[in-house]
């Protein structure tokens, strides 16, 4: 199981996405609702106060696409 979607991109979600991509080599989709503060910060800067997202992580606000692409949804 290599394609994982993490629903939510706040503190925990961004860390889980980062960990799975950088430490476990998984293909990760990180979903957040458009307009949400955490999503907008990650979209605009690629990082928050805790982690810098790996470039391999796909950040999206399209919930259907995030779920359809994944083998596992967290």
Briefly describe each language-model feature range.
Residues 70-71:
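An anion/phosphate-binding loop that grips the pyrophosphate of nucleotide cofactors and donors
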Residues 1-53, 57-67:
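NAD(P)+-binding Rossmann beta1-loop-alpha1 motif at the extreme N-terminus of oxidoreductases
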């Amino acid at each position: 199981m290599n394609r994982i979607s993490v629903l939510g991109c706040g503190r925990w979600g961004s860390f889980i996405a980062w960990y799975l991509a950088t430490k476990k080599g998984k293909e990760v989709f990180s979903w957040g609702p458009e307009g949400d503060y955490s999503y907008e910060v990650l979209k605009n800067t690629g990082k928050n106060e805790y982690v810098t997202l790996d470039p391999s992580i796909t950040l999206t606000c399209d919930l259907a696409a995030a779920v359809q692409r994944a083998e596992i949804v967290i």
